[in-house]
């Protein structure tokens, strides 16, 4: 072997750009959440006020719209808006960051790749349930009947089950059924969160009824009758609410994330090719 011979240069690994990718995840999550939060807050308030008997759905929605138009600053800087915004930005960010960190750990060259499985489901469910229960506990006290009081543990359990179902049908089920639907993943993302409302809305109404009327003296049959009284219109309202939350909001979050991560990946590859030239 000649004295001046050197081993061939191996290609440099693609830079991970960890913080840039996390920044894109955060931007996509907060932008999607900011877009849908006003609508979500309006529907959530109307359901709580309607169930407690303080207002009808339409009257509550009308009052909220007038408030947004007349006092936008007070609306967007209010505690209820902050709770809704934190809930959805936190949920989207958890899903985004798990995908990104998993791709970095496995050195996946495709920046926008998404993961699935129990770890992501449990993590996103924990984030969503924790923030959602916090939001709903405040909303129930803000707009429920009587003076504010602690939320019973049974209400927390019902809210947690409701949120686990919502996450499963928003993040895990769509990729499974997408090949079976015209329009693929986007169609699945829009349909499945709405479909699960037939199961989750009764849980939501039962929790509100337990808080509003309380007491172990109320029979199960009476609870069921009260839930059935509000079920149809509340299910429709929650479908209308969930469509932007995990349908439109989910599509927007994914679109922003994939677009900017694709751009970052292309710039990174060009820099690497230039460095090797």
UniProtKB/Swiss-Prot annotation:
Disulfide bonds: none
Stretches that traverse the bilayer: 22-42, 73-93
UniProtKB keywords: Membrane, Mitochondrion, Transmembrane, Transmembrane helix
Keyword Mitochondrion set for record: yes
This protein's record includes keyword Cytoplasm: no
Membrane topology term: Multi-pass membrane protein
InterPro entries in alphabetical order: C365.16-ike
Compartment(s): Mitochondrion membrane
GO CC annotations on file: mitochondrial membrane; mitochondrion
Taxonomic superkingdom: Eukaryota
Name listed for the protein in its UniProt record: Uncharacterized membrane protein C365.16
């Amino acid at each position: 072997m000649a004295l001046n011979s050197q081993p061939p240069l191996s290609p440099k690994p693609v830079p991970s750009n960890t913080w840039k990718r996390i920044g894109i995840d955060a931007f996509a999550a907060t932008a999607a959440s900011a877009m849908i939060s006003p609508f979500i807050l309006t529907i959530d308030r109307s359901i709580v006020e309607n169930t407690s008997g303080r207002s009808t759905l339409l009257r509550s929605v009308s009052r909220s719209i007038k408030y947004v138009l007349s006092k936008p600053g007070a609306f967007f800087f209010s505690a209820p808006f902050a709770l809704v915004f934190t809930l959805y930005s936190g949920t989207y960010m958890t899903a985004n960051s798990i995908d990104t960190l998993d791709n970095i750990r496995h050195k996946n060259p495709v920046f926008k790749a998404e993961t699935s499985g129990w770890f992501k489901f449990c993590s996103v469910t924990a984030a969503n349930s924790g923030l959602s229960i916090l939001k709903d506990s405040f909303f129930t006290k803000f707009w429920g009947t009587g003076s504010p009081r602690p939320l019973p543990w049974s209400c927390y359990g019902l809210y947690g089950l409701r949120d686990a179902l919502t996450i499963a049908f928003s993040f895990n089920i769509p990729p499974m059924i997408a090949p079976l639907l015209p329009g693929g993943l986007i169609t699945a993302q829009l349909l499945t969160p709405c479909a699960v409302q037939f199961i989750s809305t009764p849980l939501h109404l039962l929790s509100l009824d337990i808080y509003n009327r309380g007491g172990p003296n109320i029979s199960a049959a009476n609870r069921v009758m009260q839930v059935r009284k509000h079920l149809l219109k509340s299910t429709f309202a929650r479908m209308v609410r969930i469509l932007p939350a995990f349908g439109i909001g989910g599509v927007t979050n994914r679109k922003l994330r994939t677009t900017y991560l694709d751009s970052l990946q292309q710039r990174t590859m060009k820099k690497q090719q230039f460095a090797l030239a």
